[in-house]
UniProtKB/Swiss-Prot annotation:
Disulfides per UniProt: none
GO biological process terms on file: rRNA base methylation
Reaction equations catalysed: cytidine(1402) in 16S rRNA + S-adenosyl-L-methionine = N(4)-methylcytidine(1402) in 16S rRNA + S-adenosyl-L-homocysteine + H(+)
GO cellular component, one term: cytoplasm
Function: Specifically methylates the N4 position of cytidine in position 1402 (C1402) of 16S rRNA.
Family: Belongs to the methyltransferase superfamily. RsmH family.
Native organism: Coprothermobacter proteolyticus (strain ATCC 35245 / DSM 5265 / OCM 4 / BT)
Record EC number: 2.1.1.199
Protein name: Ribosomal RNA small subunit methyltransferase H
Gene3D superfamilies for the chain: Putative methyltransferase TM0872, insert domain, Vaccinia Virus protein VP39
Record's keyword terms, sorted: Cytoplasm, Methyltransferase, rRNA processing, S-adenosyl-L-methionine, Transferase
Length: 299
């Protein structure tokens, strides 16, 4: 099987309980990654049909091999924002449930050549898909100091954004910043270490979000996804960043106010302390679930 780094699915039990309302329905994991949630759902609900989608060709190759013998799972490569088109190509109108697990996969985070990792030196890439034209290298080496500071502050929520952006612009006057370790070391020298978390963590997060236009993609995707959800169907979203969660929360609130359905999670669902201890990468995860249609009971 493809050498792909798997990770534990976050809040898997809660997702399985909140997402599935029809045990013979059609469900989509639109950010399938290494197939953690997808595998659990397919095993738990053998009479249901599942579609796993991912934009990353490495993930799709792995998923295709992993689920080759699983009759109720189909794997497709694509962007979750294009879900209506993907379903149309499969001659499917609407589905019973959709899962979005936002953010970065463990494989992407740890693979040096993908350019996401602070610990493993690699090119400044950070693209979820090799089809994308813009890389983190282009952003780091071509944006103005003001533009860089804005990205780092907005998407990384980094208070020292201006100081870091200035250091980047000064450094690239000598030579372009080409690798993840060059950028990580520059940030560390500029702001120093505070605690155990690497000082470049928020900078890398900001560049990843900007490179992949993650927030724009989410804004476009949610109303499109809602269209292909059946009455009574459920949309579950796991976010890891306050800006992502804010977008999801606002859409769900607006839909409920417009009478389009109910928020099944009035209060955001978070992983237990036990899960965080077992899987530290889940610590910032937030789960929200919306049920389309009027008259359902809250879980």
């Amino acid at each position: 099987m493809t050498n792909y780094i798997e990770h534990k699915p976050v809040m898997a039990k809660q997702v399985a309980e909140l997402l599935v309302s029809n045990e013979e329905g059609i469900y989509v994991d639109a950010t399938a990654g290494s197939g953690g949630h997808l595998g659990l759902l397919a095993n738990t609900y053998p009479e249901a049909s599942f579609i796993g989608i991912d934009i990353d060709p490495e993930a799709v190759k792995f998923l295709t091999e992993k689920f080759a013998g699983v009759s109720n799972v189909r794997i497709i490569r694509g962007n979750y924002a294009d879900l209506p088109d993907i379903l149309h190509s499969m001659e499917i109108g609407q589905v019973d449930g959709i899962l979005l697990d936002l953010g970065i996969s463990m494989h992407q985070a740890l693979s040096a050549q993908r350019g996401f990792s602070i610990k493993n030196p690699g090119p400044l890439d950070m693209r979820f898909s090799i089809d994308q034209k813009v890389t983190a290298y282009e952003l780091v080496n071509s944006l103005s100091e003001e533009q860089l500071a804005d990205i780092i502050y907005r998407y990384g929520e980094e208070r020292r954004a201006r100081k870091i952006a200035k250091a980047v612009v000064e450094a690239r006057k000598v030579k372009p910043l080409e690798t993840t370790d060059e950028l990580a070391d520059l940030v560390a020298r500029t702001v120093g270490y505070r605690g155990r978390i690497h000082p470049a963590t928020r900078v890398f997060q900001a560049l990843r979000i900007a490179t992949n236009r993650e927030l724009d993609n989410l804004q476009v995707a949610l109303p499109r996804i809602f269209q292909v959800l059946k009455e009574g169907g459920r949309l579950a979203v796991i976010s890891y960043h306050s800006l992502e969660d804010r977008i999801v929360k606002q859409f769900f609130k607006t839909w409920e106010e417009e009478g389009k359905g109910l928020r099944l999670t009035k209060k955001v669902v978070k992983p237990s302390l036990e899960e965080i201890n077992e899987n530290p990468s889940s610590r910032s995860a937030k789960l929200r679930v919306f049920k389309k249609g009027v008259g359902g009971n809250e879980n």
